[in-house]
Regions:
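C-terminal and inter-domain tail/linker signature
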Residues: 1-142
Length: 142
């Protein structure tokens, strides 16, 4: 017998596969018609559009699930996220540096789709790893 826990775990693994393949249409298919992201209502295309600059700058961006907890209609995940900085990102030109960050996400599932998501990704660590704040010119300037 398949439990709700097993069903939600499988749902999330299917979603994560789309994420790691950078399949934005596939990702959007897992969202309700209006999904709240960090309490802000959005439509699926607006959610997936947020991934475009990230994937453009880090074409090998990859989420590795470290932990998953299912509690009722909620899925909590802890990830290690990696990628190589191959394109401009938030004003920093490509460095070729590899980044590794932590991410924590909580999903609320309704009718087999994600209706709400709260996400905390350590993007400050990614920015430090690609050199934001470093003296890149050797003269004290940034």
């Amino acid at each position: 017998m398949v439990t709700q826990h097993d069903e939600y775990r499988s749902l999330y693994q299917s979603y994560l596969k789309c994420c790691n393949e950078h399949d934005l249409d596939g990702m959007a298919s897992f969202y309700t018609s209006t999904i709240k992201v960090n309490d802000v209502p959005m439509d699926p295309p607006a959610v997936t559009a947020q991934f475009e600059p990230l994937i453009s700058a880090f074409p090998d961006w990859h989420w590795e699930m470290r932990h998953i907890v299912v509690d009722g209609d909620y899925i909590a995940c802890h990830f290690t996220v990696t990628g190589t900085h191959r394109g401009a990102f938030q004003g920093v030109e490509a460095t070729g540096r590899r980044v590794t960050i932590s991410e924590f996400t909580l999903y609320h599932v309704e009718d087999g789709k994600f209706a709400e998501v709260w996400d905390l990704a350590d993007m400050d660590a990614a920015m430090r790893q690609i050199g934001l704040g470093e003296d890149r010119h050797g003269d004290g300037s940034r």
